[in-house]
Amino acid sequence: MSKGSSTKKWLHEHTSDYYVIQANKLGYRSRASFKILEIQDKYQLFKPNMFVVDLGAAPGGWSEQVIKYIGKNGKLIALDLLEMAPIAGVEFIQGDFSSDETYQKLNTLVNNQKIDCVISDMAPNLSGNKTSDQAKSIYLLELALDFANTNLNKNGSFVAKVFQGQGSDEYLKLVRESFNKVIQFKPKSSRAKSREFYVIATEFKG
């Protein structure tokens, strides 16, 4: 299949996708909003006054939902390499999470406060090389877990998108070392063909 044909196929599937249509109808920033809503409905992670950090936040599908749960007295920091239009109550950092400069900016905003929940929908820019792309994905996941391990409150929680493949089982073992409860969850709003699932980790051991 030519690149042009595959692009047309993706566009057709995207524009006819139920969750894309619903997101547009409801004014959500992306279909990803439904994933975090499903996670919240099932696991009740977000509560008023919580401090949450959203990694890989753009275009804001997760942040716009989470801020509703944590309320005006909660704190939400969102970070992404791409631009994100402002969301009331959300502090945004644009930068590469893997860079020291961006990591320092995030730490400055965190200001030694303990975080209640770290959520990550990060994914690398795909090159088409599955082995390389998977390795980059695992690297970002490890960075997110390291950040959570350093900054979470005891009994805090961690949510991250994982692509099933080389290194994913080993990654789950690392998560289990830090949390008492670790669950693999594939939302209904995840595309059926996608290898993605979400790790829901609660009761951080501290």
Swiss-Prot record:
Gene3D superfamilies, alphabetized: Vaccinia Virus protein VP39
Keywords: Cytoplasm, Methyltransferase, rRNA processing, S-adenosyl-L-methionine, Transferase
EC number: 2.1.1.166
InterPro entries: RNA_methyltr_RlmE (IPR050082), RNA_MeTrfase_FtsJ_dom (IPR002877), rRNA-MeTfrase_E (IPR015507), SAM-dependent_MTases_sf (IPR029063)
Places the protein is found: Cytoplasm
GO molecular function, a single term: rRNA (uridine-2'-O-)-methyltransferase activity
Functional note: Specifically methylates the uridine in position 2552 of 23S rRNA at the 2'-O position of the ribose in the fully assembled 50S ribosomal subunit.
Name assigned to this protein: Ribosomal RNA large subunit methyltransferase E
